[in-house]
Each structure stands twice: as C-alpha cells, then as structure tokens.
Design a protein with these regions (language model features):
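Flexible, glycine/charged-enriched surface loops at secondary-structure junctions
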Residues: 33-37, 41, 109, 182, ...
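Thiamine diphosphate
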Residues: 90-103, 109
Length: 416
C-alpha cells in the first residue's frame, strides 16, 4: 500500500520499474509499426494556428533547420516542468515546453499552483535526484533524522504513509530544526533479499553511487516531482484549441485534484492517451482548407548570451518562492524579477534558449495562480494562509490575458 491510498491497489512491473516497463513496451510497439514516423532530436518551438485551430507544429531539427509538421490532430505529450527547480526528480527535458507553446497559442492552462514535491529523492553529492519510490515506505521503510530519531509519528497518525505534501513539509521542518540537508530512509525492517527483489532498480542505482541500501539507510530530501496543473483538457483530451489534444503530465483534466496519489500519473497517461485515440477513431477530423501562412508565436525576452546564468537564477528563484512553502511577499518580488523584457531581435533557433523562454513563461503563470489562491490546499501551501478555505473549492483557469474561477467539480468540455 502506498501513501494516502486507502488500500493496496497499485500494480507493479519488474519490481520498482513500472514506468520503465511501460515505456519499453510502448517503444517496442511504436518501432515495430511501419505507419509511424519517428523524428528524433527535434525541438518543437511553436504550434501552427489559424482560422480552424491547430494545424500542426513548427520544429527545429538537430542542425537548427526549421521543420513544419502538419497534422489533422496534434497531441501534446511533452511531460512536466520540474526543471524550473534546482532539485527535481524530472529528466532534463522536463522544461514545460508543451504548456508554454500551447499557452502562447491562446490555449488555457489550469491548476498551475499545484506542483507536487516528492518527499524522498536520493540526496548524494554526486548523484541526480533519483526518485526513491513511495513503495519503499509502504513496505516498511522508516524516516529518521541523522541522529536516528523516527519523527513522522509525531506529525501524523499515518506516519510515513501520510499524504506526500504532509510528509514533505514534515521533512522540511525537521531539516530546518537541525540545519541538515537530508534525512534518512531506514530499510532495516526488510531483509537484503526482500530489498533486492522488491526494489532492484533502487538497489542497483544506489550501488552505482557507492551506497549499499541492504546495509545503510538512504539519504533523502524533498524534490520537485509532478505538475498537477497543465493544459486544461476535457475527458477526451481536447484542449481549448480545435484539433489540439494533450495527455499525461502536460495536461490537466482535474483527476489528481490538489494532491496526486502515488502511481496515478502512469494511469492518467494510459487512460487519456487511449481516450484520445478512441475519440479520433470516432471523429474523422479535417480542415476545409490549409492556410498558405500560419500564425506562429516565438518568445525572445532574454539575452541569448546569458542563457546559463539566467537559467540558474530562474531555478533558484522558483525553488525559493514556488517551493514547498510559499508566501505573498516572496511571490510578488519574484513576479517583478521575471517581468518580460522583449528584444526586437529574432529569437535564435537554439533549443536551450527556447527552453529558457518556456520556463520563464510557466514560472510567471505559476506565480500568478499561486498568488490568487489565498489558502493552503494539498500541495499548495502558503505560510500566510496556512488553512484550507471551503470558499476556495475552485479551479483557477489561466487564459493568456485573464484568470477565471470555476467550481472544483467542473469538468472541462471543449466543444469544437
């Protein structure tokens, strides 16, 4: 049983490598299908829009040459935006590109204030912030301070199995008390054989960095993990722009509320990916005509020569003000620091530069939503509004030029 689940309901594949196994199986199917063309090392910079909606995308190949890709249906499945933070379990490509290009094309985003921080990411100086799955605590793993003190029972009746946001804030409180930068996840309740059989991927990864988790506790600390907000979609994966669909972490249907349960992200991607496919089978989308020219919006608001410096600044700012605990003063200051400064120069076709523009846009939108929600709910915690307000049982939908509030139970229905 994983944290906050009422019963054991999560299916696993190859021990602790369920996500990897799903990716492997899907990749195998894609590669074996002669009707699917794969374009590797392309960077999608913008959507192609016009009178009838989305006609496809503008991409750049690895040489920097622009490529126009036309489609009757365009599906964004670009993942999240964890790379806006200094510490994240996300891969390098999780820079919010799908959300950003959709937003520039006028597509509304929703629930952007709800970024989930995973309580237990590997914390070793030489290692990436590798995810230590919740299932480790579900199987008996215990959180302890450097002094060996178990602390979670003092905070919550479910102890280590409390919801992610609670465990994350409790760890943060312990670190603030002690001045340490990590706590320990103690697996001594499990035998070495149980650890190797149940968590082979974690065991091998930690061993790569010189840590034998059958003998030593795992140093862990919270890290940005999952964006529950995203492109507002309906139950068929449709967005506010005709012919554009989205699924997975880039999308927001509302199924995760303010605090996603462990393993439900994989389920989300599978379910909504299939629903989009079913919709496309039943509805033969087409255009009455293809425009000779498309509307394309690229951003060019920072100096290309300062990409690395600006990126580190952005990560530091987001970590400080859009982190586990937020408050108005810091959010307002961050908003002023990120005010766009546009250049008349044509943006360079450099994917690192374009990623930075996307990340800046998403951070600004997140700040706007976080300031708007004057309460704490799920993964969104404000120290200046520390309680949940029933009047805020609402969803914040973010259009390019305005915010709208909708009842929490609202299901989007984009009728094309």
């Amino acid at each position: 049983r994983e944290a906050a689940h009422s019963r054991s309901r999560v299916l696993h594949a190859d021990g602790d490598a369920t996500g990897r196994e799903i990716s492997r199986a899907l990749t195998k199917q894609v590669l074996s299908n002669p009707r699917i063309q794969i374009k590797e090392n392309y960077f999608v910079a913008a959507l192609l829009t016009g009178p009838e909606g989305c006609y496809g995308a503008l991409a750049f190949d690895e040489t920097g040459k622009n490529r126009t890709v036309l489609a009757k249906a365009t599906i964004l499945a670009t993942g999240g935006c964890g790379q806006i933070y200094a510490d994240t379990t996300n891969p390098q490509v999780a820079t919010g590109d799908g959300m950003a290009i959709a937003f520039r094309a006028g597509v509304p985003l929703s629930d952007l204030e709800f970024m989930q921080f995973h309580p237990t990411a590997l914390h070793l100086p030489t290692a990436p912030r590798f995810l230590i799955t919740e299932a480790v605590r579900g199987e008996g793993g215990i959180l302890r301070t450097k002094q060996g003190l178990r602390f979670m029972p003092a905070y919550h009746q479910l102890a280590e199995l409390a919801p992610r946001d609670i465990v994350t804030r409790c760890i943060l409180q312990e670190l603030q008390k002690t001045g340490d930068d990590h706590v320990y996840l103690d697996l001594s309740a499990l035998t070495p054989t149980q650890i190797k059989n149940r968590f082979p991927n974690i065991f091998e990864t930690c061993l790569t960095y010189g840590l034998d988790i059958t003998k030593e506790p795992i140093p862990v600390a919270p890290a940005a993990h999952y964006m529950m907000g995203g492109i507002a979609i309906d139950l068929n994966g449709r967005t506010g722009l005709p012919h554009l669909f989205a699924c997975g972490e880039v999308a927001n249907s509302g199924v995760h509320g303010a605090n996603r349960l462990a393993s439900n992200s994989l389920l989300d991607g599978l379910v909504f990916g299939h629903r989009i496919f079913s919709y496309l089978q039943a509805h033969h989308l087409d255009f009455s005509r293809i425009p000779a020219e498309f509307e394309v919006t690229l951003s060019g608001e920072t100096n290309p020569a300062e990409v690395d410096q600006d990126l580190q600044f952005l990560k530091k700012l987001a970590s400080a003000e859009l982190g586990i605990i937020r408050q108005e003063k810091g959010l307002l200051a961050a908003s002023q620091m990120l005010a766009p400064v546009y250049s008349d120069e044509q943006p360079p076709f450099n994917h690192k530069y374009l990623e930075l523009q996307n990340m800046r846009l998403i951070v600004r939108a997140m700040i706007t939503a976080t300031l708007k929600r004057t309460e704490s709910r799920g993964s969104h915690y404000r120290s200046d509004y520390p309680t949940t307000d029933p009047a805020w049982a609402k969803r914040i939908i973010h259009y390019p030029n305005q915010l709208k509030l909708l009842p929490a139970a609202t299901l989007y229905n984009w009728s094309w």
